[in-house]
Amino acid sequence: MPRDWDAATYDRLPIPMTAWGETVLGWLELRGDERVLDAGCGTGKVTEMLRDRLPRGSVVALDGSVSMVEQARARLGDDRVEYLVADLREPLPVSPPVDAILSTATFHWIADHDALFANLAAVLRPGGQLAAQCGGAGNIASIETALGEIDEDLRGRKHFATPEATAARLEAAGFVEVETWLHEEPTPLPEGDLEPYLETICLGDHVEGMSPEQRRAFVHEVASRMPEPLIDYVRLNIRARRA
């Protein structure tokens, strides 16, 4: 199963994904009465914007983390939102099929993108829209470099795909009108936020299972090897329709 997250800390940090999610949401052509899946809803900040775009519709808020889903429920309540804890690597318990799928900052946590896109296609009606953004090729290069300096085996645990490979996988899964592209989003962090941000957002899969002291030492070492308190994000953008 996917790892759980520190949802409360995640919610407090100055994450840029909410603003990026608003942009991705704008790619969906919505009447307001659709049923839309938020695949990787996190704490529900983007889900809330999505629900507000659907005054006569509803949202399926899905995440692999129990604490994230609980935080989303606390934010949104049960008004036109269905909550699911599920693994995007497996067939999804979503029925009937949805009219559209939105996803932000999720796909790069999943190794098997062929299975991911097949599972999404299976719960999306024919003609339904997919709008997504995740980490793409070259994402967080300064962090990956720092990890490699500590131990080469620490690099490459996330799955930052190229636009070309992603387009091919989407088409193989039954998507058409596929558009994929990269753009850079360098994100400076306020003083004092770098290490909490790294621990919660970027290095959570590395520090899972460590003691608090080990976590702090590891995160500090990574941070000390970065040239500046800036996360060098590269985003992979995805737009497509189900055939």
What annotation goes with each model-predicted range?
Residues 114-115, 129-190, 208-211:
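Conserved catalytic/acceptor-binding region of the Class I
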Residues 37-39, 43-91:
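Class I SAM-dependent methyltransferase SAM/SAH-binding core
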Residues 173, 178-229:
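C-terminal helical/coil "lid" or tail adjacent to the Rossmann-like core of SAM-dependent
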Residues 100-113:
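A short SAM/SAH-binding and catalytic strip from SAM-dependent methyltransferases
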Residues 15-32:
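Conserved alpha-helix/loop element of class I SAM-dependent methyltransferases that forms part
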Residues 93-101:
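A short acidic, Gly/Pro-enriched loop at the edge of an enzyme's catalytic core
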Residues 110-111, 124-126:
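Helix-to-beta-strand junctions that scaffold the AdoMet/dcAdoMet cofactor pocket
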